[in-house]
């Protein structure tokens, strides 16, 4: 866990349940407060399969409330039938008023011993452990298939340098034993920590720990450290790191990114020497949509790597399994993932079910009201996941260096303002641009130029969305709001260590008359301006700073990135420039579709054709 609360459940979730392949999917609740005496909440799942074929499901049993720094035990349930039934709860490490948690189990296949690395800190009665938080790593083991456990042993001398004195977390989820390569047999778990000095947190550390003697002794290996500026900003904070072995014994790490200025809520790194060092610093994955939350990994065969995490870019909901076919560099887009539930959902772990059938077990937090309501265990097959998807429909992006944009749903063609346009029926249609470094607009001037047509009388209809989702995420968007009688554009920006700020402009009228209208949105000279059909611009002071920081980043036409707002209407000639176009250039675009001299288009979508192509 991190010292941050779960996303609040202040709006209803959609109906729960996997929408496809139900026959190959089954699940049940294994931890919930009303099913167990003495606990108010269960969180932080971790699961492994022993050499005897037993599944061990660990969790934090929180006695008084669901807060992160209360009286918390590490608890366990075992399954002897591949997760179809579970024996009663066992106590592995008692909190006794303090916080014992962050379970990171790993199995030594040679000896059958199960190692469990955890952390301990003084209980606060509730809330979070304030910085500097004294958290100590401990080690336990079981030699009888998880039935009994050794007393926790303090291993700070091996795994916690003296200056990692603020936050320290193991896992929380399973570690791995390397099955190939030079370091075959090595046990590897993940750690993240912070340094506190001079009255503030000064550094973040993402690390791997390993053991070559069956877990008796441990040492720190790969470490990636990121400094924190005096204003509290930093580029990255790799946290709650999931590990998986790639072919050849390489160690792949995918982590939660927590509030760094680099774009994205996930980042990754790779070790080529069994976890002793990282080949390069962590790299963020801006268009891998998740909220800020822990996620889990499982390698399925030689070429498929699974990621389990909520797929909403802002909120903890819609648990999804996404596949990577390139060793974790990229994962499926959210519109191509396998939905486990549309309920609120949070932390998770995965395990390969014994028996050689390729069945995957997913242990995850979820609930109809809050992601912390219960912990479920799901079983699914690769048939339920589906095979690797081929290239989908696309539409050309004529901006320099751009590839085609993916077309999702049933986007159709319509008579456009210049040539053909794209028609959206509100049923999940959209156009999604693949991430390129040129797309984020940063703190500079920009211009959005597009044609829109719609005739509906209610709802919120996105024309273009660039950036993240939510009140604090940097973003730029423009949409029609016919029920409010307006077209509305918004920018949210952040500068230095200040809180995000927003500026919005609205038109007098929704222009929902079923005719084509030209829209121009410009950031220039410290102002945000919006005009329709060349009329007088509505202008307000801009929100200072960058519109491209910290959050996930996506560019979508016809839908919000979380697909919870959709356009019923049509778009044509959508262009974005990384400068402010002049009035004459905008007039030429509006009147003759003439490309401005000097270009500077970061995206240029004629929307004249939709056909086969890469996505």
PLM region spans:
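Extracellular glycan-associated modules
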Residues: 3, 393-615
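Secretory targeting and sorting signals
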Residues: 1-11
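Asp-box/BNR beta-propeller blade signature and adjacent active/binding-site loops
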Residues: 17-392
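Polybasic, low-complexity, intrinsically disordered segments
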Residues: 11-20, 475, 486-488
